[in-house]
């Protein structure tokens, strides 16, 4: 049986990923700083841990039973300090967004590289890392992989995502980590945040319509 660690399992995408991995027959451990807000996750093991702590990342990555020098087959790194436009574009949360997310990724890359047989790592990046000048024309967005440079993200959130992409690929070159990166766009759907500034645009619009209809 394959094993997977989902960092950020208490979030929207992480929760759906846990379900998909279980459907595919994986043994899954979920880790997050909080439990999932909307559903009971089908994890084989769920741990509430702050992954800004290297010690907690070591704890999360160790196999559930047996030889603790063995880690998971796959690690899905979705944990981050993030939210919708009301959270990441105001400037009020820039320091936390950059510090907290960078610490998590620094810890995950470092700890994974120390195992004799490191796990495969998937990192969830964001389209926010693309240059602002490539996103000004909604009819002609430039989001090809090679359009990321010259770098000029429009938010500190985007800069941190770009930094962490480079971090993981540096660990690939120097330590042989097997890395995969996906640059997510505006992901939304069931069990996603819908208020408090961390919701995505579609959820925010639905909430506003519902609020107006209520009155």
List the predicted regions and their residue ranges:
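NAD(P)H-binding glycine-rich loop region in Rossmannoid oxidoreductase-like domains
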Residues: 51-101
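Active-site helix of classical SDR
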Residues: 156, 160
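Conserved glycine-rich Rossmann-like NAD(P)H-binding loop of the short-chain dehydrogenase/reductase
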Residues: 26-35
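Rossmann-fold cofactor-recognition segment
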Residues: 42-54
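Conserved Rossmann-fold NAD(P)-dependent oxidoreductase catalytic core, especially the SDR/UDP-sugar
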Residues: 106-154, 180
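SDR active-site strand-loop-helix element
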Residues: 7, 31, 75-81, 121-127, ...
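NAD(P)-dependent short-chain dehydrogenase/reductase
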Residues: 133-142, 166-215
